[in-house]
Amino acid sequence: PYWLKNQATSGRFEVSNRALIGAALGPESVSVNLDFSLEGHEFTVKTPLRYKYRDRVQGEVFDPFVVLPALTLSSSEAVMVFNDQKPKSLNITLTAHRDAQKGSLSLQHPENWRVKPKYIDFDMPKAGSQANLSFTIYPPKEMQSGQLIPLAQIGDQFYTKSLLEIQYPHIPKITVLEQAQTQ
């Protein structure tokens, strides 16, 4: 949805295209123009791309067509609190959305924090496969807040997005890609 494209600040959603405000979901993310010619008259119909499948209970189901990155990441913790100097583990789950995803995962962190290991190699041969990787986080001596951002590199491409799917029977499926991070 258009209101989730930008990071929310101060309890408000930031919307770059103000003309969309008030719309339920906003325009379809992927649509095509179909050109027809009938008895010498030409016309064009714009239609959204949809993924159609059959469910034994619901019958025909139409989901919005979504283009996903090759890899998405999710963190086991949205927020980590360090009451002392003891290190904590942070687990990152990688999900491959294409075959043959091989690369390395690192964790961006504030300057005076330490993370071990510096990076972890991964190899995910099939789309849909997942890898659970773990980092140990060492906080600084002085209390400080910061962000831990997982960063997967495959060749010269970098991936930092987390996938959230919202699916209920009474609304269309909503797919949200947001920055993967731990506070």
Regions found by a protein language model. Name each.
Residues 76-83, 122:
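Short beta-strand segments of immunoglobulin-like
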Residues 1, 97, 101-127, 138-140:
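Proline-anchored loop/turn motifs at beta-strand termini and strand-loop-strand connectors
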Residues 1-24, 39, 123-127, 136-144:
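Short, surface-exposed loop/turn segments at beta-strand-coil junctions that are enriched for proline
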Residues 84-99:
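Short beta-strand elements of extracellular/lumenal beta-sandwich folds
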Residues 16-56:
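Long, contiguous interaction/targeting segments characteristic
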Residues 36-40, 51, 94-98, 109-111, ...:
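Beta-strand elements of well-folded, non-transmembrane domains
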Residues 41-74, 157-182:
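Short beta-strand elements
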Residues 14-15, 27-31, 86-90, 131, ...:
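Short, solvent-exposed loop/turn segments enriched in Ser/Thr/Gly
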